[in-house]
UniProtKB/Swiss-Prot annotation:
Keywords from the UniProt entry: Allosteric enzyme, Amino-acid biosynthesis, Chloroplast, Diaminopimelate biosynthesis, Lyase, Lysine biosynthesis, Plastid, Schiff base, Transit peptide
Name by which UniProt lists this protein: 4-hydroxy-tetrahydrodipicolinate synthase 1, chloroplastic
Annotated GO CC locations: chloroplast
E.C. numbers: 4.3.3.7
Native species: Triticum aestivum (Wheat)
Length: 388
């Protein structure tokens, strides 16, 4: 059985939401007297001669003039990236987030993964997406990882932060923070679980689109609600609307590309045909975590049915259980990340771990990330973390 780390006291015993549990730090910790972190007026205590003019228990309210230093808003961002600059990206990797044995981010391993993506030809990375387990992060962790990626690699690869949420309030706040720390674009899923109407979807996305280049993510298998074409068409006129990561299939891809809307396939096993037969711009890929060079060839070098066929067993293996279970298992067996899982994710069973090693041999170890030989890990090699 995998090693299950014993529980430790949770630092936030009464969380109510990801934002209330761990709000992302402001990039400007110091504000002028009389303003809150949001820039609103706050009562300021007065003393001495001035205090005599104020009745006991009362406070004077400080005035804020246009010359006062106010916190950065969403219109003032660290990196200005054109929407067209995002629309042109063909290979975007939904990058894995690796962990240390205590459940914290393994930034050394993460940096190595990003460098490998750059060297393999990826043009962008999704930080904290489904594959990167953003839903298992506090917003503090989430924004920190986006900022870290921008600061270390933003000059060489586009950083797209997954700042979407089923709460419009959280999506707005996280997206402001993401652009403030320098992300080039945002990825936004439609509100899940607490589903809304068509008008609600449009209103939700309209709240975040003014902040910067935006990719909308349609994945009904996870959200249990399809984003219908009328929603995307209603939003397509917005200058910050970069396009859609579409997981419904080829017909939907063609529906949008015929209208001039940029589309990235969200399905590795369909991305070749989506790109070359149905007009997709490219792919937002899971498999490129493992074989970035081959995925680059698949998106840049024209139709290649033979290469696509060669990669299909790997692509199907990756999704034999919900993503990112397969990817986490694969990267651990390649020796590029520690075999640490944040629960509720657990490694694939032994027979699937054996199958992966055979797939690596068939495709060629030299095409995969890392330098170590692929090996079958035992159950006891894995560490499962419940407090993180």
């Amino acid at each position: 059985m995998p090693y299950l780390q014993p529980p430790r006291p949770h630092p936030h015993p009464h969380p109510t939401s990801r934002l209330s549990r761990a709000s992302p730090p402001s990039p400007f910790p110091f504000f002028p007297a009389g303003t809150s972190r949001s820039g609103r007026l706050q009562p300021v205590p007065v003393s001495g001669h001035s205090a005599s003019r104020v009745s006991k228990g009362k406070f004077a309210v400080a005035a804020v003039t246009l010359d006062d230093y106010l916190p950065m808003r969403s219109t003032e961002v660290k990196n200005r990236t054109s929407t067209d600059g995002i629309k042109s990206l063909r290979l975007i990797t939904a990058v894995k987030t690796p962990y240390l044995p205590d459940g914290r981010f393994d930034l050394e391993a993460y940096d190595s993964l990003i460098n490998t993506q750059i060297n393999g030809g990826a043009e962008g990375v999704i930080v904290g997406g489904t594959t990167g387990e953003g839903h298992l992060m506090s917003w503090d962790e989430h924004i920190m990882l986006i900022g870290h990626t921008v600061n270390c690699f933003g000059a060489n690869i586009k950083v797209i932060g997954n700042t979407g949420s089923n709460s419009t309030r959280e999506a707005v706040h996280a997206t402001e923070q993401g652009f403030a720390v320098g992300m080039h674009a945002a990825l936004h899923v439609n509100p899940y679980y607490g589903k809304t109407s068509t008008e609600g979807l449009i209103s939700h996305f309209k709240e975040v689109l003014p902040m910067g280049p935006t990719i909308i993510y349609n994945v009904p298998s996870r959200t249990s609600q399809d984003i219908p074409p009328p929603v995307i068409e209603a939003l397509s006129s917005y200058s910050n609307m970069a396009g859609v990561k579409e997981c419904v299939g080829h017909e939907r891809v063609k529906c949008y590309t015929d209208k001039g809307i940029s589309i990235w396939s969200g399905n590795d096993d369909e991305c070749h045909d989506s790109r070359w037969k149905y007009g997709a711009t490219g792919v937002i890929s899971v498999a490129s975590n493992l074989v970035p060079g081959l995925m680059h060839s698949l998106m840049f070098e024209g139709e290649n049915a033979a290469l696509n066929e060669k990669l299909l067993p790997l692509m199907k293996w990756l999704f034999c259980e919900p993503n990112p279970i397969g990817l986490n298992t694969a990267l651990a067996q390649l020796g590029v990340v520690r075999p640490v899982f944040r629960l509720p994710y657990t490694p694939l069973p032994l027979e699937k771990r054996v199958e992966f090693v055979r797939i690596v041999e068939a495709i060629g170890r030299e095409n995969f990330v890392g330098q170590k030989e692929s090996r079958v890990l035992d159950d006891d090699d894995f560490v499962l973390i419940s407090r993180y």
